[in-house]
């Protein structure tokens, strides 16, 4: 009898738990709070009320009936955030803020979220298990503009601009774009092919026309001239589409901050004020069917103002599948940490440090019990590790770290610190890296990285594995990278930007690289297809364990060779390099392998008569 009663009690308890769970989780519609689609009213205050209701029901889904929703800065929450690779413009204006919320899904049902003015559409702050899905984000007036060349002479450049989509004024002879609560002047131009929407080859960061006089010939027709002969002009052909860069990177599109288990599904960002999706000090992030691409219904070739997916100081697994990017003004993906310099040793357990890059200032660099690497910046050698006991900010640029044990012998002012706890694994599959300014995928993390089954059509290098403590201070020596079954197409590396030494560029900034202290290790490039119009295929500096094998190299003649490197593979201060069993189709140009600061015996070329080591 006791056994029967005990079983009955357990079943009743389980039933009550299930009922309570169902009662706690529910579907909540923004329409319950008076917000209707296509009403053109400010959605911000209504959504704030809906989110407050969701807090009372963990596991809820907040749904938007399909339609258009508009967001203005009025009623938006304003809060200071120090966002990496973003200028310190605070407070941030937050259209939708999720703060300390767990177990919530936001389902847009295919809705359009239209922003007005400078703002951050979504912010996730100390959240867990949040899913955002089924919506698009765009701006009524983008923070980047576009035009078409109508005339190009040795004296001037005429540009046709849709003044409804990109309102402008001429102010002090500068072409100045205006929007809701902002104005900013043209400071750079990118050139796109009007038919393919690819960045025109060998244009890249052509910084001409920074000094100019602007005049309006007719409404929507602007002439840039150079009476002082200071503009360093270039002359794109009539019909060329120009992305007219202005404004600054001051808000992310989606900011994921100190959050865990975040998912984005079926989301399109047609524009952002700065970085597209910025994940900072967050863990376990999954993006599936997420796209940062031009809004073709508005005849745009431009999309985001800067990077696409940017991950700094993250951990756990970054899983990126079935995503695409095009028309960005910076890299589609960048994964890295942040180095800081030791300015002063205050005691055996206390060091004063400084953010050396202004777009890193203000961040919380670390937390108790996290592991620190100590780096000698000239060779980029990690000489020791330690544990952090306390982080104390002195100001936006400087901070004090208290260590759990005394500083390792030999570490002194001038050394650099790296957070080794905030280093993620990454899986990037079935994605399309379309034509954007700069490179395709930047990865700097010691975690396990798999890059497979992707298509690359980047303007610069398709993949950059960097890391430095001397310029950008973006840390992360890789230890396990597999690049497999990808298709590297023209226009990969058809324009030169920083670090674009080859289609795949392994280019850490090391002032004095030494082969006995390799920075990166265990990089395998296998079973890929390269469509090559130029010589440089692979550049690698300071790698221990580099394999380039079973790839198919196909000659492409879409554009003529232009790159200053005339070798296929360039190796510097590397060891244990294997080049083998690669298939050649057509008269591929880059057959020479050059080495520097290493011996011929450090490279093994086998089953591959095509590649020849330069003596």
UniProtKB/Swiss-Prot annotation:
Reaction equation(s) it catalyzes: Hydrolysis of terminal, non-reducing branched (1->3)-alpha-D-galactosidic residues, producing free D-galactose; Hydrolysis of terminal, non-reducing linear (1->3)-alpha-D-galactosidic residues, producing free D-galactose; Hydrolysis of terminal, non-reducing alpha-D-galactose residues in alpha-D-galactosides, including galactose oligosaccharides, galactomannans and galactolipids
GO MF, any single term: alpha-galactosidase activity
Family matches, as SUPFAM superfamilies: Pectin lyase-like
Signal peptide (from-to): 1-23
InterPro entries in the record: Beta-barrel_GLAA-B_II, Beta_helix, PbH1, Pectin_lyas_fold, Pectin_lyase_fold/virulence
Keywords for the protein's UniProt record, in alphabetical order: Glycosidase, Hydrolase, Repeat, Signal
First and last residues of every PbH1 repeat: 282-313, 423-445, 446-467, 478-500, 520-541, 543-573
E.C. code: 3.2.1.n1, 3.2.1.n2, 3.2.1.22
Family under the similarity heading: Belongs to the glycosyl hydrolase 110 family. B subfamily.
Function: Alpha-galactosidase. Removes both branched alpha-1,3-linked galactose residues of blood group B antigens and linear alpha-1,3-linked galactose structures.
UniProt protein name: Alpha-1,3-galactosidase B
Organism this protein belongs to: Bacteroides thetaiotaomicron (strain ATCC 29148 / DSM 2079 / JCM 5827 / CCUG 10774 / NCTC 10582 / VPI-5482 / E50)
Gene this chain is encoded by: glaB
């Amino acid at each position: 009898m006791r056994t029967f009663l005990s079983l009955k009690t357990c079943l009743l308890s389980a039933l009550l738990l299930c009922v309570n769970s169902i009662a706690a989780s529910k579907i909540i519609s923004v329409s319950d709070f008076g917000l209707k689609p296509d009403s053109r009213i400010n959605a911000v205050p209504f959504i704030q009320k809906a989110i407050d209701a969701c807090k009372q029901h963990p596991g809820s889904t907040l749904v938007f009936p399909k339609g258009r929703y508009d967001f203005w800065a009025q009623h938006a929450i304003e809060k200071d955030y120090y966002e990496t690779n973003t200028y310190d413009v605070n407070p941030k204006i937050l259209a939708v803020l999720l703060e300390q919320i767990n177990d919530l899904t936001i389902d847009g049902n295919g809705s359009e979220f239209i922003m007005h003015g400078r703002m951050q559409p979504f912010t996730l702050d100390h959240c867990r298990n949040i899913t955002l899905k089924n919506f698009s984000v765009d701006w009524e007036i983008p923070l980047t503009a576009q035009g078409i060349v109508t005339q190009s002479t040795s004296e001037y450049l005429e540009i046709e601009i849709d003044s409804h989509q990109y309102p402008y004024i001429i102010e002090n002879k500068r072409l100045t774009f205006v929007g809701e609560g902002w104005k900013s002047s043209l400071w750079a131009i990118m050139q796109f092919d009007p038919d393919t929407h690819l960045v025109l080859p060998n244009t890249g960061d052509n910084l001409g026309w920074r000094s100019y006089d602007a005049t309006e010939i007719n409404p929507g027709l602007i002439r840039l001239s150079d009476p002082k002969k200071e503009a360093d002009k270039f002359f794109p052909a009539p019909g060329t589409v120009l992305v007219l860069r202005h404004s600054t990177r001051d808000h992310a599109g989606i900011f994921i901050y100190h959050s865990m288990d975040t998912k984005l599904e079926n989301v399109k960002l047609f524009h952002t004020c700065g970085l597209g999706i910025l994940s900072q000090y967050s863990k376990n992030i999954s993006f599936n069917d997420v796209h940062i691409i031009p809004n073709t219904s508005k005849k745009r070739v431009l999309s985001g103002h800067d990077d696409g997916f940017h991950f700094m100081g993250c951990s756990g697994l970054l899983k990126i599948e079935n995503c695409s990017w095009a028309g960005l003004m910076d890299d589609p993906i960048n994964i890295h940490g942040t180095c800081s310099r030791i300015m002063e040793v205050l005691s055996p357990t206390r060091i004063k440090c400084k953010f050396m890059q202004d777009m890193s200032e203000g961040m919380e660099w670390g937390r108790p019990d996290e592991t620190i690497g100590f780096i000698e910046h000239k060779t980029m050698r990690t000489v020791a590790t330690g544990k952090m006991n306390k982080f104390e900010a002195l100001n936006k640029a400087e901070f004090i770290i208290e260590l759990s044990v005394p500083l390792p012998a030999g570490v002194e002012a001038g050394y650099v610190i790296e957070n080794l706890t905030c280093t993620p694994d990454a899986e990037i599959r079935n994605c399309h890296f379309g034509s954007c300014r700069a490179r395709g995928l930047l990865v700097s993390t010691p975690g396990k990285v798999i890059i497979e089954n992707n298509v690359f059509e980047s303007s610069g290098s398709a993949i950059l594995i960097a890391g430095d403590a001397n310029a950008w201070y973006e840390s992360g020596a890789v230890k396990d990278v597999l690049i497999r079954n990808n298709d590297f197409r023209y226009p990969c590396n058809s324009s030169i930007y920083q670090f674009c030494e080859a289609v795949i560029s392994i280019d850490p900034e090391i002032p004095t690289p030494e082969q006995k202290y390799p920075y990166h290790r265990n990089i395998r490039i296998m079973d890929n297809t390269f469509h090559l119009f130029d010589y440089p295929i692979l550049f690698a500096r300071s790698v221990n364990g580099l394999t380039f094998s079973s790839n198919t190299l196909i000659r492409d003649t879409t554009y003529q060779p232009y790159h200053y490197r005339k070798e296929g593979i360039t190796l510097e201060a590397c060891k244990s390099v294997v080049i083998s069993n690669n298939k050649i189709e057509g008269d591929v140009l880059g057959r020479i392998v050059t080495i520097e600061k290493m011996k011929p015996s450090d490279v093994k070329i086998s089953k591959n008569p095509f590649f020849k080591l330069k003596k």
